[in-house]
């Protein structure tokens, strides 16, 4: 949920310094400081609770204290995604007043780009998942080693599958923090206090069937560093985000809850796609391998 705000610059600097001093001890993936409380990890664990993930595999996907996990990778310094707007559902900002910095169609294009990237990553996860179990139902490479790099390049098929799942989940979780989807209505909206849509559940628009139009009134904040210069006169990320419990926008708990619901929905959608593509028998075995810490012992 967290972007490169001044606090994140401190975190990034600490991470780089830590890497230089002790490469084995990079420990900032799920931050529990500077107002942050491992939101992506907590959302993922809540959303996937009861889905059958082994403890070690869930640690890889969600992260744990001292690691980013697959879901936290877009916020990791050096991964190259911190300032990629669609990886965090940013820059879909618009306000109904003359001369606003971008048009409604431009804002909607940014929102569509975020959704498109989510499903591109889910499609990549679906493709890599096929390497875990062969058509004859024998196992492929099901290992993860001691850890997964989640660097966009290296890793076993299971690591790459988890990585792409994590990238998709990160964007969908950020959507609820960075947009006005769950926000309470504002009686007199302004650029600094934009309207809320007051939804209580996941956005159908982020589901597997793309509706024809972006939901009316949906926006996300303009992100840039520094925002006062990059987003002058616009609905800023700073105005809309619910990244931390102390945000002035309010709605943190609701955003966390709905993001967890969407996380489970995305896993269920992905599971259905695995079965549809690879058949029930092979597909169920693939899903078992993804979830299991010891797949060759537990997946038959």
Model regions and ranges:
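Catalytic glutamate of the conserved HExxH
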Residues: 167, 171, 175
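Bacterial N-terminal signal peptides that target proteins for export
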Residues: 1-12
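N-terminal signal peptide c-region/cleavage motif recognized by signal peptidases
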Residues: 22-23
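N-terminal, motif-rich segments that launch catalysis or mediate targeting to/interaction with membranes
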Residues: 26-166, 178-300
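Classical secretory targeting signals
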Residues: 18-19
């Amino acid at each position: 949920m967290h972007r490169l705000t001044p606090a994140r610059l401190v975190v990034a600097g600490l991470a780089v310094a830590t890497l230089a001093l002790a490469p084995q001890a990079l420990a900032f993936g799920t931050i529990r400081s500077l107002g942050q409380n491992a939101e992506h990890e907590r959302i993922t664990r809540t959303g996937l609770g009861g889905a059958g993930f082994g403890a070690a595999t869930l640690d890889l996907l969600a992260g744990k204290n001292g690691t980013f996990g697959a879901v936290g990778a877009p916020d990791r310094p050096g991964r190259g995604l911190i300032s990629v707007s669609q990886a965090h559902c940013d820059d879909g900002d618009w306000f109904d007043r003359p001369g606003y910095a971008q048009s409604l169609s431009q804002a909607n294009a940014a929102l569509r780009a975020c959704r498109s990237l989510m499903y591109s990553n889910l499609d990549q996860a679906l493709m890599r998942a096929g390497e875990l179990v062969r058509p004859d139902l024998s196992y492929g490479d099901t290992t993860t080693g001691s850890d997964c790099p989640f660097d966009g390049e290296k890793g076993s098929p299971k690591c790459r599958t988890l990585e792409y799942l994590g990238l998709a989940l990160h964007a969908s979780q950020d959507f609820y923090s960075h947009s006005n989807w769950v926000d309470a209505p504002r009686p007199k909206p302004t650029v600094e206090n934009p309207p809320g849509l007051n939804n209580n559940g996941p956005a159908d628009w982020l589901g597997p069937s793309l509706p024809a139009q972006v939901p009316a009134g949906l926006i996300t904040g303009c992100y840039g560093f520094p925002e006062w210069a990059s987003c002058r006169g616009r609905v800023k990320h700073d105005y809309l985000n619910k990244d931390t419990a102390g945000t002035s926008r309010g709605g943190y708990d609701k955003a966390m809850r709905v993001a967890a619901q969407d996380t489970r929905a995305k896993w269920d959608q992905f599971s259905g796609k695995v079965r549809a593509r690879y058949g029930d028998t092979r597909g169920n075995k693939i899903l078992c391998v993804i979830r299991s810490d010891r797949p060759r012992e537990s997946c038959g």
